[in-house]
Each structure stands twice: as structure tokens, then as C-alpha cells.
Amino acid sequence: LVACTLTILAGSCREDAEVICPNAIQQEWAEAEIGVLLHMDMQVFVPDYNWRNYGSHPDPSAFNPAELDTDQWMETASKLGARYAVLVAKHGSGFSLWPTEAHDYSVRNSSWRDGKGDIVADFIASCKKYGIKPGIYANTNANGYLYTDRGRVREGGPVSQVEYNAVVAKQLTELWSNYGNLFEIWFDGGVLTPKEVGADVLPLVKKLQPDAIAFQGPLGHDNLIRWVGNEQGTAPDPCWATADSTTNSDGVKIIEGLHGRPDAPFWCPGESDFTLRYNTSFEGGWMWHEGQDSLMFSLDELMEKYETSVGRNTNMLLGVVIDNRGLIPDADVRRITEFGEAIRKNYGTTTVRTSGKGSNLTLKLPAPTLVDRVILQEDIAKGERVLTWHLEGVTPSGETLTLCDGTNIGHKRIARFDPVGVVSLHLVADSYKARPIIRNFAAFECLN
């Protein structure tokens, strides 16, 4: 790290102005930045199976990942730089990766380990071993085994709506009671309320996992995060961490307010999820299918997704497939490892950096340097304060150039611009709702 000079011109506003601030748990989640979402379901073993063809579910004996190794999963996640991992414990088929007591369609009746295994327990143990925070996805809205889609039981199924809701409550109770504290809980498609015929999830999460971050969780939970409106790893720009209640649930339909609002009443930041493969691949790239390695995103494409997710004030959640052996495929391990190395190469070591309070920060470089990107970070413990900003560069000849501009900064903004040789950079907060507190203003030398 190179020493640099800081100049601060204070803005005319109160430092203690009223702004929405995250709690300590939400701050910890923002610091995590990178997670993985691990997928394995019955389709991995029976590719022609469509869980919406009710009554056609494969026999549970078809599920047999004979080489399953959750340590391999977490070792790979570590190479990416992931701080947390979310296991899809039950996806659309209804097949459950733990020996649930709620119904018979689970590992308890599979060929794998003679029905005595528990993938959720193995996953939690591996997370602890590798220092990765664990999370669980359990889809409350879809269950092909019980003829349910979007939270509503279809005609001809084995259970009533009331019985299905009891299954949901029992399974969530098992997952939230038997495996310790969870860092994140994933509600795919949001949560139907009891008024919408759904199970009463809010009291359960408040009682059993009050500290968990909840993706698209029930309104009333303290630690909500929201969908960004796509599964491409591209957060909207701007993407404020404060949002209205309408943006934190029901990802099934197109919803308004995906950008959030700087004056919204809830701290509810975005999480950008995407797969390692193009969405034209099997199950949108979320599930493994033999022969689709060529559909993986290139390293350049993945780096762009990092910059449009983490670099736009959201966390990045990479979808990772588990194959029919129970392993992350070799080709995927290589690409994920390369992705992590590229993130660290591009953003692990700054050329210069500083921090400070006020509407104008100056970053002096030790010598004329060709730069092409900066990282900006607010101290979000004091809320998001900057509304608009621009970046200036001073060339060796003394010319001042406007390099880029933007709206929100939040936890992290990565701003790229055409390479330019500069001796100093100036960050100017053009508008703000309280005195800006910049915890990190970092410049990076052009690598190419």
C-alpha cells in the first residue's frame, strides 16, 4: 500500500442526519460479498424428469451420488473467495436432501448410503471446516411430489392446502432447528402469507433463525435482502440498499422498485444470483447435465458479472452445479478457481487508497500512473449518504479530466473508465443527504 495525501472539503450538512442504517448482521452480510448456491435435485439423475408433470416423480432410489464429497464443494468455494454458501436442500421436485420426517420423498429412501445419509449435515460440517458461513434454500412454493407450484396445491394431489402448509412448516422447523445457526435463508419466489393461503413462516423464522439473512423473506423479518430482477449477475444501476416492502419478496413476477430508493424506509439490499453456464443450458444452468461444459461463461464474462454485482452494491451469488457423482465437475472447478484468481488479481491489491469524510476527496499517486478503475465504498454503518458523484483525474500536464460519474455508492462501487495517466484523482460528491463518509477510495493501475 502506498502512502497518499487526503484533502477534505466538508459539505454543508449534518453528520448525524437521519438516514436508514443496517444492523450489525446486515453489515456482516455486505462484507461477505461473495457466496455460492449449490444445486442438486432428482433431475441430475433422471434428466427427462419434469417436476411439473405431477405423479411422474422418479423413485427415490434413483438418487445415488456415490462419490458425494461436501469438502470438495467447500474447497472449491474457498478458491472462488466465497464467504458463504447456500445449499439447495429441496428444489422443485420435492426430493429432500436430508432425512425429513415430513414425507417419504428424501434421502432416507434413496440408494445413497443405504438411506442413512444426510447431505445437509455433511454440508454444514464442511462449511465449518473451511470457515464458510452456511445457508439453506428450501423452496416453500414448489413441490412436484406434492403437486404444488407457486405455493398452491393443484388438483389430484395427495395433500390438501392445509396439509401442504403443515409439511412446509415441519420441514422448515427441521432445517432451522437441527443444523445450527444459518447465515442466510433463501426463499425462491418469495413467501406466500397465510392470507394468500401460504404457511405462516414469519413466526418460525423469528423464533428459530432470528439472525439469519432472508432472501425474499417475509415482511417483518429483521434481516431482509431482495432480488435484483434477473438471474444474469447484473444488478440494476443504481441499486440502493434501501427499498420499499414491495421489492423484498415474490420474485416469481416482474416487480417494481428493483432499483430501491435512497429515501425508502427499509434496509433491504440486493443479491445478484447467476449460474456458471448460459441459461440456454439444462434447467437454466442451475442443474448439471452431461456434455454442457462448453456452455460455461468465459472468464471475461464472469469478471463482468462480478463488476455488475459486487461492483453495484449487491452481493454476488454464483450458482454451482453438483453432478451425478456428488461432486462439482472438474471443468467447473477449474473455471471457478480461475474466476477467484482473476478477482484477486484485478482487485486484491490497490495502487493507492484513502478514506475520509466530506464531499471532496483527493488521492495523490506517488508517480504518474495509468489507471482504469477505482473502488468506492461508503461506511454503510452510517447509512448510504451519497446521492450523486463524479470522478476527476489530473494528468501530468495539469489538465483535469472527468473520468466517470454515478449515483449511489453504498458498500461497494466499482467504476471503470478508459485508461488514463494521472498524478491524482478527485472524488466529488455532487449531492448527498448527509455528510459523506468514505471508508475506501482505491485506485488500480491498468493491467493491460
Ranges and model annotations:
Residues 16-419, 426-447:
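Mature catalytic domains of secreted/periplasmic carbohydrate-active enzymes
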Residues 1-17:
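Bacterial Sec-dependent N-terminal signal peptides
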